[in-house]
Amino acid sequence: MTEAGAKKAAGKKSGKGKGKNAKKNQPNITPVAENRKAKFRYEILDSVECGMMLMGSEVKSMREGKLSLDEAHIRVTNGELWLVGSDIAHYNNAGMWNHDPRRPRKLLVHAKEFDKFAGRAFERGLTLIPLRVYFSERGLAKCVMGLVKGKKLHDKRETIKKRESDRGLQRAMRRK
């Protein structure tokens, strides 16, 4: 074995350097888009992570941050979950192979989670909405779906009052 080959083999055995565990310790999950109004408009009861079926131009556009979840919701149709009302802008370099910005997108979820969420989504007053969209460590598009209940006006006011009182407490604690 040559000297360079011996160093290479020794480096692998020692376990130093970058390996599979290097990424696991530092998750880099930055959201592409968040539904910021969801916490204000709805009471979030439960959430689950699901995959998204996307076209190539949609993925590239999402990586540029051109995704809006403002009017989006999730519909259950024929035993499948569909993200409806989200807007992924056209990708500039896609040319004639671009996607429809408002098309419904299929969400992928395990059967047990589907049964749990789809069954509860049909209860009165509950709905499914996307809370956050991001790319996983493997580069897959993921959507965090939430089972929510709409807040009344007085509930929203309570939330605002609670938030303001918490801020006041934080300010008082910093002064001491």
Curated annotation (Swiss-Prot):
<keyword id="KW-0694">RNA-binding</keyword>
<dbReference type="InterPro" id="IPR023620">
    <property type="entry name" value="SmpB"/>
</dbReference>
<dbReference type="GO" id="GO:0003723">
    <property type="term" value="F:RNA binding"/>
</dbReference>
<comment type="similarity">
    <text>Belongs to the SmpB family.</text>
</comment>
<dbReference type="GO" id="GO:0005829">
    <property type="term" value="C:cytosol"/>
</dbReference>
<dbReference type="InterPro" id="IPR000037">
    <property type="entry name" value="SsrA-bd_prot"/>
</dbReference>
<feature type="compositionally biased region" description="Basic residues">
    <location>
        <begin position="9"/>
        <end position="23"/>
    </location>
</feature>
<keyword id="KW-0963">Cytoplasm</keyword>
<dbReference type="Pfam" id="PF01668">
    <property type="entry name" value="SmpB"/>
</dbReference>
<protein>
    <recommendedName>
        <fullName>SsrA-binding protein</fullName>
    </recommendedName>
</protein>
<dbReference type="InterPro" id="IPR020081">
    <property type="entry name" value="SsrA-bd_prot_CS"/>
</dbReference>
<dbReference type="GO" id="GO:0070929">
    <property type="term" value="P:trans-translation"/>
</dbReference>
<feature type="region of interest" description="Disordered">
    <location>
        <begin position="1"/>
        <end position="33"/>
    </location>
</feature>
<comment type="function">
    <text>Required for rescue of stalled ribosomes mediated by trans-translation. Binds to transfer-messenger RNA (tmRNA), required for stable association of tmRNA with ribosomes. tmRNA and SmpB together mimic tRNA shape, replacing the anticodon stem-loop with SmpB. tmRNA is encoded by the ssrA gene; the 2 termini fold to resemble tRNA(Ala) and it encodes a 'tag peptide', a short internal open reading frame. During trans-translation Ala-aminoacylated tmRNA acts like a tRNA, entering the A-site of stalled ribosomes, displacing the stalled mRNA.</text>
</comment>
